[in-house]
Design a protein with these regions (language model features):
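Surface-exposed peri-terminal alpha-helical interaction modules
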Residues: 1-225
Length: 225
């Protein structure tokens, strides 16, 4: 019996190893500008943060779509993954804060009219929120949110909290994104698409599932009477 040679790749495609071939690292790592093409050295930092964020958002969208059609247990697992993806996207913004305002200004000249509003990942995720809420309401079967939170029946209560956590993570990203922009270019200027940066600040208060936030007010008021 001939021993298998594990030093040689067995998958098709370019790359010296199966790791490179499966992950298509040649293509992936060619998506960033070379050192010779960069107008400023921090273009690599900026591009890496945003490209990796789009990958995490792609996964988040995949998991949310799964949650819409899954039974409760699987939906909770998928929503938990989506939440972790959003945490990673939010944490990645810290790297942008390591750029000085001067360096960011240099990179900004290369962005054209590109802005965070154009993120296909966030746009897709936003479009999936109504479907999530519709599915959750179907699971409630006429049970009010107030009764749900008074008695905490599982798995409905866990699903409600998972939706709230997803909504909360989107808000946390908006806050961090706004503060990152304010720190790098200021809050009283015009963005790359001609929109005042202060508009980002107003988006902080938007909610995907406002009913889940409002029921907390109802519970608190009811407890005080």
């Amino acid at each position: 019996m001939v021993a298998e040679d594990f030093s040689q790749p067995i998958l098709d495609g370019p790359g010296a190893t199966d790791y490179e071939r499966y992950l298509r690292t040649d293509e992936l790592l060619a998506l960033q500008k070379s050192a010779e093409e960069m107008h400023h050295r921090d273009e690599l930092l900026f591009t890496t943060v945003h490209q990796s964020s789009e990958l995490w958002l792609k996964l988040a969208c995949f998991e949310v779509e799964e949650a819409v059609h899954a039974e409760a247990g699987a939906a909770l697992r998928s929503l938990g993954r989506a939440v972790l993806c959003l945490r990673l996207v939010t944490d990645a913004l810290e790297l942008l804060e390591r750029m000085s305002p001067r360096d960011f200004a240099a990179v900004r000249t290369q962005l054209g009219h590109g802005a965070g509003f154009d993120s296909p990942g966030f746009r897709r995720l936003h479009s999936l929120a109504p479907g999530l809420w519709e599915r959750f309401n179907a699971e409630l079967g006429g049970l009010s949110l107030l009764e749900l939170y008074r008695h905490e029946p599982e798995p409905l209560y866990a699903l409600a909290e998972a939706l709230l956590e997803l909504d909360e993570l989107v808000t946390m990203w908006r806050v961090r994104h706004f503060k990152t922009v304010e720190r790098t270019i200021g809050a009283e200027v015009i963005g790359t698409q001609g929109t005042p940066v202060e508009v980002l600040g107003r988006l902080i208060h938007k909610r995907w599932f406002p009913e889940l936030w409002a029921v907390r007010n109802e519970l608190t008021r009811a407890a005080a009477t």
